From Swiss-Prot:
UniProt-recorded name of the protein: Aspartyl/glutamyl-tRNA(Asn/Gln) amidotransferase subunit B
Coiled-coil segments: none
GO MF terms, alphabetically ordered: asparaginyl-tRNA synthase (glutamine-hydrolyzing) activity; ATP binding; glutaminyl-tRNA synthase (glutamine-hydrolyzing) activity
BP-aspect Gene Ontology terms: glutaminyl-tRNAGln biosynthesis via transamidation; translation
PROSITE patterns in the cross-refs: GATB (PS01234)
Amino acid sequence: MADYETVVGLEVHMQINTKSKVFCECSTRFGAEPNSNTCIICTSQPGAIPILNKKAVEAVVKTGLALNFSINKRCTFARKQYFYPDVPKNYQITQSEPPLCSRGKLAITIDGKEKIINITRIHLEEDAGKLVHEIGNKKLDYSLLDLNRAGVGLMELVTEPEIISQHEALEFLKELKNIVEYLGTSECNMEEGKMRCDVNVSIRPVGQKELGTRVEIKNMNSISGVRDAIAYEVERQKEVLNSGGKLTQETRLWKAEEGITKSMRSKESALDYRYFPEPDLLPFNLPDSFIEELQKQILELPRARKARFIKDYGISEYDADYLTSTRMIADYYEEALNALKNQKSDSLSGNFVVAAKLLANWISTELNAKLNASKTCIAETHISSQNLAKLVSLILNGTISGKIAKTVFEEMYEKSIEPEKIVKEKGLVQISDESAILRICEEAISESPKAVAEFKSGKERAIGAIVGLVMKKSKGKANPQLVNKILLEKLKAY
């Protein structure tokens, strides 16, 4: 059997985050009544003339600048011929040559090492409508046509064939999605069709320079679906070649429920699309000032923010990965940090890195678990960044223990109450009076002769049983550090 290597290229379509469509004033709102967001332009009535949405051009150029593209100042549009029922004009307004953005790149991390994936282009185009094959759970034996999506602005990004595994494809899409969400140029919500990916997969014998027969895969509605589709298709192609067969250049459909790809149609070539200049949209030039202004709007991107979090706040790479996984989470963390800085507490002075680490841990563990369980995002959480900062401050200044803090956190999440109020109402203030803790420790020691004997014989872990008894007697309120300190002193002197 021959040894093959995988070659993957991605075509990523991202819906541009604008209120109106790219060539008309119709709304882009998702979930509207079918065919309610339409007009004579996006349904291609005779004589209707498209008018370019400036905000759509800004979004594409801004994305290109963030991904290190060269911006082509000469902007032209073309007609790409399609004969599908969801394209009412029988052509799509798109860009052929030149695209708005040429020759960009994106860094991904694979097995701890950075790899650069070169990107051929990003161009601006309009979306098609949508064929509906079921209503609710009822499958139809006919198709319905919803043109609400027709004419919505898209930016299509095309990579070079430099991705060599499904894992690299997954990381590329995750990194791209994160950057574009940070920029605000697309919401990239795959469930709503605001980010779609077509995958071109081929294999070739190891060492061969010429690319193998390319197969395009469509219909992936999640990033993990892209990964799974590539993995399946690579194995399918290997089986075909190893059995003496030949691969066909075709478009295949990913069937997620079956975990297979299925032949859809033969793959068109560029000639089949019969591109020609769009006569209703004249070419125009982008001023240098237009590009420069967009460049100024690009602030800190995810990788740079992650590096800063690690350097300035001393947090782990794991926590930094999670905290910068979306702009909303990163903003929440820094808002909470600023709130922590502004609190006048002696316990925070000179201890900011400890506070930053503790706060990061609470967001990436406790809060993250709640968000996952409720399937919500951090923007919808009941705990404000200011209130989480207050909770962390209560731990740091010794008012409550970490264990008690989890009880307080639960109530904060359920009822949106400030932590100080919960602590006061429930009498949860930590006992830090040494004389009070000493009395409880002495009681616990006298009631734990077996654990004391084991500790004295060298089994230092036996102290855990006595600590547990102290915490039980104090209803979890005793300061754990003081408990350990006093018990060690008493036991060593026993």
